[in-house]
């Protein structure tokens, strides 16, 4: 079973799972050999985009936007005419205290299941050395792998991973997400990777609201019944971080649906976040780590073992704990024109959506190659998109908007 150890100066920890080993540094550059990275993190020049950028976003909206009315509850009006949908049309004013322990506990998982009838397996598909040759192929269904609880405290064993909270027309919802590196802000990233369906409704709607990220949620692994009355710092040890910018793939926006596999090949998103109560430090400096994303991963035959993480919330889980699964992924193709998806045995359920798929690269370091997207009603496997140039464009777009470049 994999864990993500907290990294301290001059200490190299390992993520061990089956044949998989990697360093998930909690300091910004320790995996790159900078052993003094935690000797005294300096505040980033811009830990948040601030009021000026919010006003710029508001000024560019296609209708008049009343911030005070929004914060007083107008955000709960999901009228189609004011439900922002397009890339760049996103506002998310911080509402202090909205995501308290009680409301976090009420958040439901967004169902993203797929019917077996949508999957056409090829029992004899040959392996490929080129990712392009993986397109259009679906390997036999993976054997279920029982998810295992990640050791606590999560600040030591999984700090870059947390929960993504948001409001949809159905009420408060929850997914999972991961702190990832910002190419334009090395060591000071405020970026989080998650699934597209955790930020945008796809073809039937627009951007979700009150998007926030809580890294190392429920740090000490309290039971679900204990969380509501627990100390806030036990539930959100690094605080609540509100999205100030977000983007997903155009493929998800144009094709994504609430259930089934439509749009799943592009089910990826990046959030830029800022702390509800500003600390002057970036998210990466605060939690101590950010992961690389590999947008040019090998063909499935060369991936090796992968570890899937998330906070499953649907039965038999309750969303309180972080879990992981380790498996060797196969190929899944719903749209043969798109890069292949990966699927792997895993019993995690809804709520794990957006959680990372990690593999060990040739430098013996962890990298994110996908995020949890869809699974069957029986919860025996999970699938995630191969991250390609369109996904890279999502990261680059958000990075350029918030960090320059």
Predicted stretch roles:
Residues 264-342:
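Chymotrypsin/trypsin-fold serine protease catalytic domain
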Residues 26-30:
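C-terminal motif of bacterial Sec signal peptides marking the signal peptidase cleavage site
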Residues 33-186:
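Protease-domain processing segments flanking chymotrypsin-fold serine proteases, especially trypsin-like
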Residues 347-371:
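Catalytic nucleophile loop of clan PA
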């Amino acid at each position: 079973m994999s864990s993500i150890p907290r990294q301290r100066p001059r200490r190299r920890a390992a993520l061990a799972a089956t044949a998989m080993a990697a360093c998930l540094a909690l300091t910004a550059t320790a995996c790159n050999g900078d052993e003094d990275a935690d000797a005294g993190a300096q505040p980033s020049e811009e830990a948040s985009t601030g009021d000026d950028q919010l006003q710029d976003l508001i000024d560019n909206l296609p209708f008049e936007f009343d911030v005070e009315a929004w914060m007083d509850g107008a955000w709960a009006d999901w009228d189609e005419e004011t439900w922002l949908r397009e890339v760049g049309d996103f506002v998310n004013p911080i509402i202090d205290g909205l995501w308290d322990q009680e409301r976090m506990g009420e958040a439901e998982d967004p169902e993203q299941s797929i019917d077996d009838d949508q999957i056409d397996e090829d029992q004899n598909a040959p392996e490929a050395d080129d990712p392009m040759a993986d397109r259009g192929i679906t390997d036999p269904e993976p054997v279920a792998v029982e998810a295992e609880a990640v050791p606590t405290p999560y600040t030591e064993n999984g700090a870059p991973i947390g929960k993504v909270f948001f409001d949809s027309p159905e009420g408060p919802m929850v997914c999972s997400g991961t702190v990832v590196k910002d190419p334009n802000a090395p060591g000071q990233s405020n970026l989080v990777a998650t699934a597209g369906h955790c930020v945008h409704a796809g073809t039937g709607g627009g951007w979700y609201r009150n998007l926030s990220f809580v890294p190392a949620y429920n740090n000490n692994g309290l039971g679900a019944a204990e969380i509501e009355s627990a100390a806030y710092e036990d539930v959100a040890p690094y605080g609540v971080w509100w999205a100030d910018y977000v983007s997903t793939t155009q493929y998800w926006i144009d094709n994504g649906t609430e259930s089934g596999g439509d749009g799943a090949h592009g089910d990826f998103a990046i959030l830029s976040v800022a702390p509800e109560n500003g600390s002057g430090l970036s998210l990466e400096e605060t939690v101590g780590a950010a992961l690389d994303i590999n947008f040019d991963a090998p063909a499935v035959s060369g991936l090796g073992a992968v570890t899937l993480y998330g906070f499953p919330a649907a039965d038999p889980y309750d969303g309180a704990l972080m879990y992981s699964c380790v498996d060797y992924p196969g190929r899944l193709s719903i749209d043969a024109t798109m890069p292949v998806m990966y699927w792997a045995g895993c019993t995690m359920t809804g709520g794990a959506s957006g959680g990372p798929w990690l593999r060990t690269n040739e430098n013996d370091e962890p990298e994110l190659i996908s995020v949890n997207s869809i699974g069957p009603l029986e919860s025996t496997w999970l699938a995630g998109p191969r991250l390609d140039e369109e996904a890279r464009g999502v990261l680059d777009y958000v990075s350029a908007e918030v960090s320059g470049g």
